[in-house]
């Protein structure tokens, strides 16, 4: 396994991060336990979850993933072996705390304490803001509509997080689904007012969505706030299993087709087919090629992988052993030029 510093913290995290969002929906607790056991045995010391999980998010499964992880900690007594990341949900989920989903006051206090209780731990290594309080364009949405009173409480949020860092409930903090403008506002306040510094940005990044490179890559490198990429396989498209419009029974697209609209774009299958041809030409597993491409980016701290089977998990973790030649990278970049970011 490979390791990198999380931002400018003292934490060395594996460059493969264990994703968990299927646990409690597509995966049973028993299957999740098997994944955690295996991932740790392979040196994956960085695990990511969220209060909102399992996914697709529903009131009935809210918090289930954290509870499964907490049960594993209780049974195995290996909390100290894991760098644990979770996320507090932003606005738009009315069933969470009666819709009071700001990142300050009682809402944050309740969210944090509830996560700690479900996870059966007294601290979280990386506490992330799942998405901004303000309206932002994501998942390829165009036509930004500015609302004068739509604002993020940057300084108040950092002061609130500082309280829980000082209490020992949080070690470090991070962002998710954030924009360059939002990231820089947080960093400026941290520098100017000696407030907690954001250590990471958890945003989508894959062969089908390299939009992170446009603005956030520079921020990550210059400011030492690395990317934690989610959806490196574009919810399975870059494994090749959805080629020719086929959705295998039990797969994410077959189960929750209406939820994953971000991948149903005109050039998705065309780009996937070209990447598939590259993997076959150079005798590479398509999933491993896709994950390794993400891991090798200078701005990348860790690639979050998810799996519904042990076979998938083993394949994805073994991507750290793969080498991508200059020829492979060149051909990948050529596909990007023909089909630029089909699933932003």
Stretches with model-predicted labels:
Residues 7-26, 85-99, 128, 132-141:
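N-terminal small/glycine-rich loop or linker at the start of catalytic domains
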Residues 27-39, 104-118, 183-187:
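Short, acidic/polar
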Residues 46-50, 83-87, 123-129, 174-177, ...:
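Short beta-strand segments at enzyme active-site cores
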Residues 94-128, 204:
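Active-site gating/metal-coordination segments in enzymes
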